[in-house]
Amino acid sequence: MNGIQIVSTGRALPKQVVSNDDLSRIVDTNDEWITARTGIKNRYKCEEETCVSLAVEASSKALENAGIDKNEIGAVIVATSTGDYVFPSVACMVQKELGLDQEITAF
C-alpha cells in the first residue's frame, strides 16, 4: 500500500440553512441556549440535494483543487451515516456520476 495519499479535499453543503432562531419558532428554545451548550449556530438541511449529489460536488472540487485528471484516481472511499440507499453504496454512485473507471475500488 505504498504511495497512497490524499492530495486534495473538497466540500459541499446543502443550500438550506436552518438557524437557531429558525428552531426557536418550532420548539421551545433560543439561540443563546443552543449556542451555549453546543456551539452550533446554523445547520444545513437537504431539500433537493442528496448524499450522492453532495459527494459528487465535493469530489469535483477536490479534483479541481488538486489539478488532477479523474483518470488518475485509484479508489473512491466514502464515509457517511446518511447514505441515500442501502445498495448501491454512495461510493459506487459517486464513481458512476464522475464517470470513473468501473474497475477501480469503490467503498
Across the structure, where does each feature detected by a protein language model lie?
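Short glycine-rich or small-residue beta-strand-to-loop segments that form or flank ligand, phosphate
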Residues: A75-T80
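Conserved active-site "lid/cap" helical segment
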Residues: M1-G74
